[in-house]
């Protein structure tokens, strides 16, 4: 369950390491985000020479969440960390590599580029 002030690990090579969620997109009273949801965040930690700098405001999609997500077959999927991938304006990833596994739910939400770049889809 990702909400305002949640900290996320960045799962791509855009140059950011950690994000702080400012807003969950998808309605004026939406409080929580899950896998495949888009959030607005600020970069709290970044590596030198990266595409993004500390303090930048970015959009990101959640690719891993500690809170379990129920699937249509009745099974649940949960990860060890909360992680996101930073997006460009057209909902394409800003980085060129994705680190770690991503959830299959991203395919249903039309993030095909992220799914194709990921080393493992669970």
UniProtKB/Swiss-Prot annotation:
InterPro entries: Ribosomal_uL14, Ribosomal_uL14_bac-type, Ribosomal_uL14_CS, Ribosomal_uL14_sf
GO biological processes: translation
Keywords, alphabetical: Ribonucleoprotein, Ribosomal protein, RNA-binding, rRNA-binding
One Pfam match: Ribosomal_L14
Gene Ontology molecular functions: large ribosomal subunit rRNA binding; structural constituent of ribosome
Gene3D superfamilies: Ribosomal protein L14
Highest taxon of the lineage: Bacteria
One Gene Ontology CC term in the entry: cytosolic large ribosomal subunit
Family the UniProt entry places it in: Belongs to the universal ribosomal protein uL14 family.
HAMAP family reported in the protein's UniProt record: Ribosomal_uL14
Subunit structure: Part of the 50S ribosomal subunit. Forms a cluster with proteins L3 and L19. In the 70S ribosome, L14 and L19 interact and together make contacts with the 16S rRNA in bridges B5 and B8.
PANTHER family from the UniProt entry: 50S/60S RIBOSOMAL PROTEIN L14/L23, LARGE RIBOSOMAL SUBUNIT PROTEIN UL14M
Job description of the protein: Binds to 23S rRNA. Forms part of two intersubunit bridges in the 70S ribosome.
UniProt-recorded name of the protein: Large ribosomal subunit protein uL14
Species name: Corynebacterium aurimucosum (strain ATCC 700975 / DSM 44827 / CIP 107346 / CN-1)
Record gene name: rplN
